A protein has these predicted regions:
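Conserved single-residue anchors adjacent to enzymatic active/cofactor-binding motifs
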Residues: 1-221
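Short, charged alpha-helical interaction segments and adjacent helix-coil junctions
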Residues: 2-6, 78-83, 184-296
């Protein structure tokens, strides 16, 4: 959770992510982050921000939003999602998002040629997500890449959909100087930027990111938006914590599972009443569209 006395934003918080990576003025920062996790032959040279709203994306048929969406000069689509706590079926949700964007690309195709450009989804994960990880194979690994490939040979026939998970909770290097390569440096900075103090140390290659994320340097309008997002984020955090405690109390009285379910229901009701989009409520509570509909 961000504080009012820190110098830099937290890129993994909703308010910090919007202020740093969703601002077109900070496009070079976003390009640097994407290139740190993309394969060397898939580098981004330039990009344009695209609408985050995707018509008909939810199972309820309503428009929804991803955290960030952009297109590069070659027409490839990129989605960036930040997830700070585990949620049910997150892997499937990412596949669904990327598939929908890929399907929308067919509209630009020529007749039945299906000349559809690739889609990349990069998910920044701040907590353990329960992925099946064999310690003998995943020791020291925190970036995983998924795509369509032939099972026996591993051959990729064509570039279609790629999903990249950056599991920041698995990244354990404590000092910036311990990092080897851009991917590790970016992982360290994403986790620790909000704790840094100006002039305490030098971080080669991240001068632009630090300048863009310095709260005192925000314009009056941007600072007002950032503060409003911070308040909303704290309110949602307090709602979740309160509901969790209420759910635990009810769980002691009527069974833990039932209590947790009631807690989630109360959280969802409060979020919907505050005007939060249904997709965001589902993401934060784990409830389905049908369950939300029953609360109205």
């Amino acid at each position: 959770m961000e504080t009012s006395i820190q110098t830099y934003v937290n890129p993994l918080s909703d308010a910090g992510f919007k202020a740093l990576l969703c601002d077109p003025a900070n496009k070079p920062v976003l390009i640097g982050m994407l290139n740190a996790f993309l394969p060397p032959d898939r580098m981004v040279e330039d990009l344009e921000y695209a609408t985050t709203e995707i018509p008909g994306l939810t199972l309820a048929g309503k428009a929804s939003r991803v955290d960030l969406r952009c297109t590069d000069t070659r027409g490839r689509s990129f989605i960036v999602e930040v997830q700070r706590s585990p949620q049910p079926n997150f892997f499937r949700r990412c596949v669904y998002y990327a598939s929908r964007i890929y399907a929308l690309g067919a509209r630009r195709g020529d007749g039945q040629r299906y000349d559809i450009l690739p889609v990349y989804l990069v998910a920044l994960l701040d907590r353990g997500f329960g992925f099946r990880r064999d310690p003998s194979e995943w020791e020291g690994r925190y970036v995983s890449r998924y795509t369509f490939r032939e099972k026996e040979t591993g051959q990729v026939e064509d570039e279609t959909i790629s999903i990249i998970f950056v599991e920041l909770d698995r990244f354990g290097k404590e000092e910036f100087g311990e990092c080897a390569g851009a991917a590790e440096e970016w992982c360290w900075m994403l986790k620790n930027m909000w704790r840094l103090q100006p002039g305490a140390a030098e971080y080669p290659g991240f001068e632009g990111m630090l300048a863009a994320g310095e709260i005192a340097g925000f314009s009056k309008e941007k600072r007002a938006k950032y503060d409003a997002d911070m308040i909303t984020e704290r309110d949602m955090y307090n709602i979740l914590e309160t509901a969790k405690k209420e759910g635990e109390a009810k769980g002691r009285e009527a069974g833990l599972a039932e209590g947790e379910a009631k807690g989630k229901t109360e959280v969802a009701k409060n979020m919907l009443a505050s005007g939060m989009p249904e997709e965001q409520v589902m993401a934060m509570t784990g409830l389905t569209a049908e369950q939300l509909a029953a609360l109205k």
